[in-house]
């Protein structure tokens, strides 16, 4: 069994958390998530979340802490164990969200209470 490591970030602006929606037709298309992605070889998870956040949202962030970790077996039945870490983030400079249309088609800012109604993966919900 192989291991896959993921890193995501929770950014709060004006009391609301940034969520992005996966593009229809992609894996989990239409689902909302926190920005982030796969840890590349030689990269630390905290570096991954900063890189992925910039790629997916156009925002420059820094890590301020860890919100949680979760591991699970691959949902598609591949012999793989997934390990996800969610980090707390702040913006280096406030900016406008610019999505990568290849991956995401919408974004929104929700309070923790508003986000409770979203269909979120457990590792995202636990990190709110």
Say what each PLM segment does.
Residues 15, 37, 51-52, 64, ...:
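Structural detector for helix-capping/boundary residues
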Residues 16-55:
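Conserved Nudix-box catalytic region and its N-terminal flanking loop in Nudix hydrolases
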Residues 1-18, 86:
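Conserved N-terminal beta-strand and adjoining loop/helix that marks the start
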Residues 56-63:
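Short secondary-structure junctions
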Residues 1, 9-10, 24, 77-79, ...:
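Short secondary-structure boundary/capping segments
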Residues 4, 12, 29, 34, ...:
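Short connector loops at helix/strand junctions that flank enzyme active sites
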Residues 61, 70-96, 108, 112-113:
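Active-site-adjacent beta-strand/loop module that shapes the phosphate/pyrophosphate-binding cleft
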Residues 98-128:
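NUDIX/MutT-family hydrolases
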């Amino acid at each position: 069994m192989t291991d896959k490591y993921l890193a995501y970030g929770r950014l709060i602006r004006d009391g609301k958390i940034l969520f992005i929606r996966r593009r229809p037709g992609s894996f989990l298309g239409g689902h909302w998530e926190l920005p982030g992605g796969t840890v590349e070889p030689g990269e630390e998870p905290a570096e991954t979340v900063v890189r992925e956040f910039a790629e997916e949202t156009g925002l420059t962030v820094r890590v301020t802490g860890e919100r949680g970790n979760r591991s699970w077996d691959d949902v598609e039945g591949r012999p793989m164990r997934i390990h996800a870490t969610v980090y707390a983030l702040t913006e280096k400079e406030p900016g406008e969200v610019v999505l990568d249309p290849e991956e995401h088609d919408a974004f929104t800012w929700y309070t923790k209470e508003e986000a409770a109604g979203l269909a979120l993966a457990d590792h995202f919900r636990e990190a709110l």
